From Swiss-Prot:
Membrane topology field: Multi-pass membrane protein
Annotated source species: Saccharomyces cerevisiae (strain ATCC 204508 / S288c)
Cytoplasm among keywords: no
Name by which UniProt lists this protein: Uncharacterized membrane protein YOR365C
Residues in compartment: Cytoplasmic: 225-238, 396-415, 474-516, 567-571, 627-703
Keyword Disulfide bond: no
Length: 703
């Protein structure tokens, strides 16, 4: 048996029936709620004979409550409770009010992962001290501890204290004693249980950040050293990995009806890929900025500890949520404007109701970011990212200049020294491609919020700017391929023979086959459609889920058909990622209640979602690490890879043009002039197309 027996319901009814959470915020429409403080843990420390930390490793607690009846005759201003199995002690602190004045019968149900695992019915008059029989109108204040018998506490499986993001809650319904058929509920409350374990961890997030950044940095380093093949593959793998992380983060922003706690926690680990990172001083700065630009900031997160539930006392024909309910019961109850609200701008509104936060609002709250600062947070990290790239290029160029002054050999990086401006533009184009999903979604979200005039203008400008930049780059690459194929009969020639064009746009095009560089436009369109669906349709969770599923399905079908990436390994890598993206989108069809399935189905699909994505993330992690290790191990890493069948290597110039080498180093330039003058030799003009026609092994002529 699970916690109902542990709590000895007849003895502690008040803990189950007179609930009110200190932060009455429904984090998503599944009524999952979050508390960032738990004062009873501190109060309990004075009662333990041994160090308190030894007892807090395992516990069940709750400070979250949802009213599941529209005409409940109970309300509470404060509620916290915790059970510690090491000494079988239950601590509680309750401040509640009631207008009931009759004998009450309680029906309590324990629901775990959508299944009713225990039901108990008892009469309040069975309580020994008889304080609640009959129940009288007025205030009720209880604070203390209760010892639970060891025989009862031992019935709780030990795994209950260790399952991360426990999906369990207690539904308590009050009836009049004369209502033997339980047809007219007087009150209903739902209490969420937690054991403090979660799969949301900063350690995982930072490891993924380091892995992704390392992949991109490795690709840049190998590119500067002339290992273009290795650089292209590392960059392609790292970007695909980052896009997978972004897809998980974006899925969490869909405004679904029920998001299992473990799914919400796991996807929160990837919000950094969307620039959603909390830094305290930045949040204070954003608060000031919104106010200074005549905006109306939200104060939900800052006031989370004083928000409360005020239950309306009107007959609204409520529907009680039970274990046998599907998500329709939750959806219908949350459409009641007298009990629930999603209005973030009216503090008087959500101080008297349950504030339902779905999709982007839920993600923002769980990240510790005020909802009116959501766009500014992601936008600021985009600006910081761009500035860091520019600063890194300037510092590296200055460093090379200093080395040259001290006559240190820097010939290995002469390509960067000569073409640093074009390389910087190319890196910025790559950055725009990486963050396009983030900025387009945040900007479209801001269009619907208008936190202030300044933030709206910034959203419009940055959205238009990055869309135009990425679109123009995609079109230029596609037109260059068409022109090359038309004039030379080789789509690769103009794409790879011009150092300026390659340095500027090669970061975008080199991961694709030369005949399939137009796939960049397809990828950009896929990201834009996803951003439109998630950013603009937050009030329509089912439409979002259907649109995302169709978008992923069409993209995957075309990807499998066209196979546009440079080789089989890269195609397989990307197909596997987008296959899982499609499966994840399918899960969210269930979470949106499109099929009106029982809650248990959604709960167990949430577990499958977590294990599937955790295993796949581990596979990607190992795959990328192996690629890094092999690149470092080989002295010439390009020799590991088979030549790409579009003959691009035939048209790639060396590390740099001969003239550029000599002109970059004055001593070599003067030596070259002297040798040519003495020998009367002029540099021959080589037609690479003619040579390629004459030599079947032309693919390796210009390596």
């Amino acid at each position: 048996m699970l916690p109902i027996k542990v709590f000895s319901l007849s003895r502690i009814f008040v803990l189950l029936a007179i609930f009110r959470q200190i932060h009455a915020i429904s984090i998503n429409s599944s009524t999952f709620q979050v508390s960032n403080s738990f004062t009873l843990l501190n109060n309990a420390s004075t009662l333990f004979p041994v160090p308190f930390d030894a007892y807090t490793k395992e516990y069940l607690r709750t400070s979250a409550l949802l009213t599941c009846a529209k005409d409940s005759q109970f309300s509470a201003s404060y509620f916290e409770a915790a059970f510690f199995p090491r000494n079988n002690t239950l601590f509680f602190n309750v401040e509640a009010q009631t207008i009931m004045s009759e004998n009450i019968t309680i029906k309590a149900e324990l629901i775990a992962y959508g299944l009713n695992v225990y039901t108990k019915v008892f009469d309040l008059c069975g309580i020994q001290d008889n304080l609640l029989c009959p129940l009288k109108p007025g205030n009720i204040e209880l604070m203390g501890s209760y010892y639970v018998e060891a025989a009862v506490a031992s019935q709780i499986p030990s795994i209950t204290y260790n399952i991360p993001d426990l999906d369990a809650y207690i539904v308590v319904t009050a009836y009049s004693t004369i209502d033997k058929e339980f047809t007219k509920p007087l009150a209903c409350v739902q209490v969420m249980l937690s054991n403090g374990r979660t799969v949301q961890t900063e350690y995982l997030s930072w490891n993924l950040v380091i892995l992704t950044i390392s992949g991109i940095m490795f690709s840049v380093v190998y590119s500067l050293q002339g290992y273009t093949v290795t650089s292209t593959r590392l960059a392609s793998y790292s970007i695909s990995l980052l896009l997978y992380f972004q897809n998980l983060a974006i899925l969490a922003m869909i405004s679904v009806s029920f998001l299992p706690p473990i799914v919400a926690a796991w996807t929160q680990n990837f919000q950094w890929s969307m620039g959603i990172i909390r830094i305290n001083f930045m949040q204070r700065l954003f608060d000031w900025y919104v106010v200074a630009t005549s905006g109306s900031p939200t104060v939900v997160y800052r006031n989370k500890e004083v928000l409360s539930i005020s239950v309306q006392k009107r007959s609204l024909n409520s529907k009680i949520i039970s274990a046998s309910s599907n998500l329709n019961g939750i959806e219908s109850s949350q459409k009641n404007d007298l009990l629930y609200t999603s209005n973030l701008r009216n503090s008087n509104d959500y101080l008297s109701k349950i504030l339902v936060l779905r999709g982007i609002k839920r993600v923002s709250y769980k990240a510790g970011i005020e909802i009116s600062n959501f766009f500014l947070t992601g936008f600021s990290f985009f600006i910081i990212f761009i500035c860091m790239i520019i600063l890194a290029f300037i510092i590296f160029k200055t460093f090379l200049k200093v080395l040259q002054k001290f006559k240190v050999k820097t010939i290995r990086y002469l390509h960067f020294h000569t073409h640093w401006s074009a390389l910087l533009q190319g890196t910025l184009y790559r950055a725009v491609f990486i963050i396009y999903s983030e900025i387009s979604l945040l900007a479209l979200w801001e269009f619907t919020q208008t936190d202030s005039a300044a933030t709206l203008v910034e959203a419009i400008v940055v959205f238009i700017l990055i869309t135009v930049l990425l679109s123009s780059a995609s079109v230029r690459i596609w037109r260059k391929m068409i022109k090359s194929k038309k004039i030379f009969g080789q789509p690769s020639y103009l794409l790879f023979s011009s150092s300026k064009f390659l340095n500027k746009f090669g970061f975008l095009s080199s991961q694709f086959k030369s005949t399939k560089v137009w796939w960049l436009m397809a990828t950009s369109a896929h990201m834009l459609i996803r951003s439109i669906l998630v950013g603009s349709l937050q009030a329509h969770g089912k439409s979002q889920s259907i649109g995302i599923f169709l978008n992923e399905a069409i993209y995957l079908i075309l990807l499998c058909w066209m196979q546009p990436y440079m080789d089989k390994t890269t195609n397989f890598f990307n197909i596997s990622i987008h296959s899982l993206n499609l499966v994840n989108a399918f899960f969210f069809l269930f979470f949106s209640n499109l099929f009106q399935q029982p809650i248990a189905v959604s709960s167990f699909m949430g577990l499958i979602f977590f294990f599937l994505n955790a295993a796949f993330s581990l596979y990607l992690f190992i795959f990328i690490l192996i690629c890094f290790t092999m690149a470092i191990y080989y002295k010439h890493p390009d020799t590991r890879y088979k030549p790409i069948d579009d003959q691009r290597r035939s048209f790639l110039k060396g590390e740099m043009d001969d003239d550029a080498v000599y002109e970059s180093v004055p001593e070599l330039h003067e030596m070259k002039k002297a040798v040519l003058e003495c020998n009367g030799i002029q540099k021959p003009q080589i037609n690479k197309i003619d040579l390629c026609k004459q030599n079947s092994n032309c693919e390796y002529l210009y390596m």
